[in-house]
Amino acid sequence: MPELTTAPGLLALVGLAAYLLGAIPFGLLIAKLFGLGNLREIGSGNIGATNVLRTGSKPAAAATLILDAGKGAFAVILARVLVGEDAAQIAGAAAFLGHCFPVYLKFNGGKGVATFFGTVIALSWPLGLAAGAIWLATAYTFRISSLSALMAALMTPIFAWGFGQRELVVLSLFLGFLIWIRHRENIIRLLSGTEPRIGAKKR
């Protein structure tokens, strides 16, 4: 973490605002807008872009991906411009937590992968690109979204350390740990060989 130079009260307000932004369930809203039905009753029941893709609508999945990543990036950039770097990291973490545990959905949200990428790339674009490269390489090789996310989450703090961005190591460890926790059912399916591949419709 960077040195905390901002007043704690202001950091708390930044965190609350970022959390409420991150908690917006864009996947659910887009699925309804596209007439795809209740996303909670489709595929895995998750509200993220991967599950939206299982409806067969690539435009809806792309829109969900962009908006879920965008809320993390927007929270970071706005906090950085208005307050400072310490607030930017708080905002990124809070937006991620909002997506995973949204107050609007009784704290039952998504797995945070897109918001993770949006947050990381806004905090450090080289780190975000490196994490994205790991996701793409794993997805290309194995065609499994969850495995790609897990590998990217695992490697991001290692990249942060290697790039000399020590102030991002703790945050990326925290976010990566939560991604692994949120993917615990996927990990079980990966170990049993039953995890669906990208584009597969899970019924």
UniProtKB/Swiss-Prot annotation:
It comes from the Bacteria. It catalyses: an acyl phosphate + sn-glycerol 3-phosphate = a 1-acyl-sn-glycero-3-phosphate + phosphate. GO terms for molecular function: acyl-phosphate glycerol-3-phosphate acyltransferase activity. The chain crosses the membrane at residues 10-30, 59-79, 87-107, 116-136, 168-188. InterPro entries: G3P_acylTferase_PlsY. Pathway: Lipid metabolism; phospholipid metabolism. It is a multi-pass membrane protein. It is an enzyme of class 2 (transferase). GO terms for biological process: phospholipid biosynthetic process. Its main location: membrane. It is found in: Cell inner membrane. Pfam families: G3P_acyltransf (PF02660). Keywords: Cell inner membrane, Cell membrane, Lipid biosynthesis, Lipid metabolism, Membrane, Phospholipid biosynthesis, Phospholipid metabolism, Transferase, Transmembrane, Transmembrane helix. Belongs to the PlsY family. Catalyzes the transfer of an acyl group from acyl-phosphate (acyl-PO(4)) to glycerol-3-phosphate (G3P) to form lysophosphatidic acid (LPA). This enzyme utilizes acyl-phosphate as fatty acyl donor, but not acyl-CoA or acyl-ACP. PANTHER family: GLYCEROL-3-PHOSPHATE ACYLTRANSFERASE-RELATED, INNER MEMBRANE PROTEIN YGIH. Probably interacts with PlsX. This is Glycerol-3-phosphate acyltransferase. The gene is plsY.
